[in-house]
């Protein structure tokens, strides 16, 4: 269903914000990624969250103002990104698990190498982070919401822009993957059938979710 883009309220809990991000476009450094898979983490109420035990130097950004980026090192190698949500002082975040490159394909490929297929360039949190050019210096960066495809040409000083979706995609929700704690929580959301989504089991074992506007 097509509709006018609506601003996402990042003061809402992560499990509310997460499905709203599917179909939205995140831009940084000449690359635009349409988000196809995300995962919600509920702060101190979620054993799998980096924020479960309260603020630390690593995760303090999650307790700060919403609509900022929390970037962390995964396995000491990859850089993964989360969009911070919930009110200031209450930790919450949405892990950006996968997306498809819609602008800056050559730039993303230069960062990822020649081997991955186009649909795999931003498949998985670390790969998405690499394609988007994430690094730890970007931790805490503001994310501006822009509309009408303004993208990098929009008058904003923020290093990241997010264009909310203008059409509600089909959405599936299911268990989180790649973690051991609270893994059964139905807090992963994805666009069914999209080849950029985690594969193969990441595309399975979910139930349809009626997306809110």
From Swiss-Prot:
Enzyme Commission number(s): 3.2.2.-
Pfam (any one): Pur_DNA_glyco
GO biological process: base-excision repair
GO MF annotation terms: alkylbase DNA N-glycosylase activity; DNA binding
Key word Phosphoprotein present: no
Top EC class, one word: hydrolase
Family statement: Belongs to the DNA glycosylase MPG family.
The protein, known as: Putative 3-methyladenine DNA glycosylase
């Amino acid at each position: 269903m097509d509709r006018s883009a609506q601003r996402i309220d990042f003061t809402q809990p992560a499990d509310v914000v997460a499905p709203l991000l599917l179909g939205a476009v995140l831009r940084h450094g000449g690359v635009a990624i349409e988000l196809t898979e995300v995962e919600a983490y509920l702060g101190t109420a979620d054993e799998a969250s980096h924020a479960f035990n309260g603020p630390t130097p690593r995760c303090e950004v999650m307790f700060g103002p919403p609509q900022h980026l929390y970037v962390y090192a995964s396995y000491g190698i990859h850089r993964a990104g989360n969009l911070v949500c919930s009110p200031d002082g209450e930790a919450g975040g949405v892990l950006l698990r996968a997306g498809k490159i819609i602008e800056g394909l050559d730039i993303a490929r230069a960062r990822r190498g020649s081997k991955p297929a186009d649909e795999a360039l931003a498949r998985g949190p670390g790969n998405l982070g690499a394609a988007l050019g994430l690094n730890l210096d970007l931790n805490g960066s503001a994310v501006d919401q822009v509309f009408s495809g303004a993208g990098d040409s929009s008058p904003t000083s923020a290093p990241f822009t997010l264009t909310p979706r203008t059409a509600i995609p089909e959405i599936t929700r299911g268990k989180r993957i790649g973690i051991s704690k609270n893994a059964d929580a139905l807090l992963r959301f994805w666009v069914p059938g999209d080849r950029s989504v985690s594969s193969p089991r990441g595309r399975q074992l979910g139930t349809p979710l009626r997306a809110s506007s």
